[in-house]
Every structure is written in structure tokens, then in C-alpha cells.
């Protein structure tokens, strides 16, 4: 029994692997780097048709995302093409609108409610301190004060400021009359 020699048979079975040259390695590295840089969608991907949908559906449909409405648009204006809108026909019976009616208050109650309004008091305090209000708040204050004036006129209530001014004028006249410089 002869034994085969290990070294001779192994060399015959194995073929020598060719090593890549430096130039080939550099070229492959450049290609890998270029492929790595270019990621994302390819140029013009919107205009390319999707082949998978065409094959499955059996119908020829263009799935272009740029295409919008399929409605034809008339480019020229013709007299016959102008369509006048028809007025809506009114129902024979008037339809009653269901509106949640606010409970009506007497002018006295409404005036008392407006005078005791905390928001109005706070905004008036801010105005007195010299702050400027936003346009929305200012318009609300103006409307509320106008409503208070209207209610006071309806109820016949006058502001007490006029009486105080008249009393001050009377005091000034009395002081002027008693002034000794005027007597000369």
C-alpha cells in the first residue's frame, strides 16, 4: 500500500489565485466610492411609467402624477357656452330656522350685568394705568361702553358728572364775586 504524497497532490488540485494589481484595486475603490455618493432617486423618476401596474391591471393607464383633472377645459369664450346660473327655487313653505334664542333681559338687568362685568373692569383698569389694549379688546370695550350708554339713555339715567361740574362752576363764580380785586 503505497501512500500518496501529500504535497504533490495538493498543489495540482489548487489553482493559483491571481492577485489584483494596485491599479485594479484603486479603480474598484473609486467605483465603490462613486456608487456610495450617488444615493436617492434617479433623475426623471416622475416621468417614468411604473411597469408593474401596467402589467397587473391589463389596461393601458398612464399614472403620471403631473396630470390633474380629466375635465375638458374650453379655451375660447362662446356666447352659447356661457351658462347663467339658475336662481335656487324657494321652497313653497318657509323653513323655520332653529336658533337658540337668548333669554331676553330687561334693560335694567342688562345694564347691571354689564356694569358688574369683571372683564370690562379689568380692561378699564388697564386703560387707566396707561396700557394699550389689543385691537380686539379695544373694540370690545368700545362696544360694551356704547351699549351701556344706550341702556342708560333708555332708562333715563344721567351721569352724575354734570352735576359736579355745575357745582364747581357755581363755586368759582362765588369766589370771583367776593374777590376784592374785582371791586376796584
From Swiss-Prot:
It comes from the Bacteria. One of its GO terms (molecular function) is GTPase activator activity. InterPro entries: YihI (IPR007336). Residues 8-32 have a biased composition (Basic and acidic residues). GO terms for biological process: ribosome biogenesis. Keywords: GTPase activation, Ribosome biogenesis. Residues 159-169 have a biased composition (Acidic residues). Belongs to the YihI family. Interacts with Der. This is Der GTPase-activating protein YihI. It comes from Pectobacterium atrosepticum (strain SCRI 1043 / ATCC BAA-672) (Erwinia carotovora subsp. atroseptica). The lineage of its organism: Bacteria, Pseudomonadati, Pseudomonadota, Gammaproteobacteria, Enterobacterales.
Amino acid at each position: 500500500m503505497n501512500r500518496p504524497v501529500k504535497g504533490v497532490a495538493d498543489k495540482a488540485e489548487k489553482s493559483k489565485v491571481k492577485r489584483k494589481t494596485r491599479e485594479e484595486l484603486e479603480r474598484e475603490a473609486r467605483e465603490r466610492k462613486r456608487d456610495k455618493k450617488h444615493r436617492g432617486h434617479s433623475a426623471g423618476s416622475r416621468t417614468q411609467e411604473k411597469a408593474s401596474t401596467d402589467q397587473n391591471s391589463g389596461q393601458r393607464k398612464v399614472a403620471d402624477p403631473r396630470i390633474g383633472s380629466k375635465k375638458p377645459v374650453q379655451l375660447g369664450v362662446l356666447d352659447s357656452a356661457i351658462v347663467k346660473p339658475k336662481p335656487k327655487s324657494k321652497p313653497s313653505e318657509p323653513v323655520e330656522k332653529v336658533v337658540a334664542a337668548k333669554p331676553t333681559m330687561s334693560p335694567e338687568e342688562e345694564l347691571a350685568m354689564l356694569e358688574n362685568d369683571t372683564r370690562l373692569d379689568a380692561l378699564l383698569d388697564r386703560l387707566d394705568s396707561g396700557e394699550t389694549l389689543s385691537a380686539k379688546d379695544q373694540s370690545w370695550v368700545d362696544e360694551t361702553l356704547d351699549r351701556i350708554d344706550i341702556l342708560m339713555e333708555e332708562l333715563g339715567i344721567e351721569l352724575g358728572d354734570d352735576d359736579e361740574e355745575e357745582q364747581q362752576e357755581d363755586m368759582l363764580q362765588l369766589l370771583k364775586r367776593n374777590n376784592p380785586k374785582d371791586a376796584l
